[in-house]
Amino acid sequence: ITAGKDVCVQWVRGYYILGDDLHNQSIFTKILKAAQEGKETFPFTSGKNKYDFISVQELADQIALVAMQNKVDGIINCCTGRPVSLAEQVEKFISDNNLNIKLEYGAFKDRPYDSPMVWGSRDKFNRILDEYK
């Protein structure tokens, strides 16, 4: 459709977006609510699955850089490129927010259909970053 035309089609793909934790349905929101309700434990999985966590601010910065250029097109991952276990990220969240709540590991079984690791390749974004510098 775009062949021979002056068009740049970009499909930006974000991964596990962190931030704005009071206004979404993430596990982080649920932990905040449980802590606010005075709960001392939070039912959890094994936490072993790994995800590409990115702050909403970093994601916004990456999207802006993608949109300001037209040399790299197609599907562009806006991500960190680093898989981090859910347990590690949630424990960090609890610590960073000084929450008095402990994870109840194994209360929920890991879902067999979840991928053990999901993260993005930064190859295309790094090309954009190299051009920007």
Predicted regions and their residues:
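Short, amphipathic alpha-helical "lid/cap" segments that border enzyme active or binding sites
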Residues: 28, 56-64, 133
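Short aromatic/basic micro-patch
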Residues: 11, 53, 83, 118-120
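NAD(P)-dependent short-chain dehydrogenase/reductase
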Residues: 1-50, 56, 93
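Conserved C-terminal active-site "lid" loop/helix of NAD(P)H-dependent oxidoreductases
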Residues: 56, 87-88, 105-132
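Glycine-rich Rossmann NAD(P)(H)-binding loop
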Residues: 17-21, 43-50, 76-84, 106-115
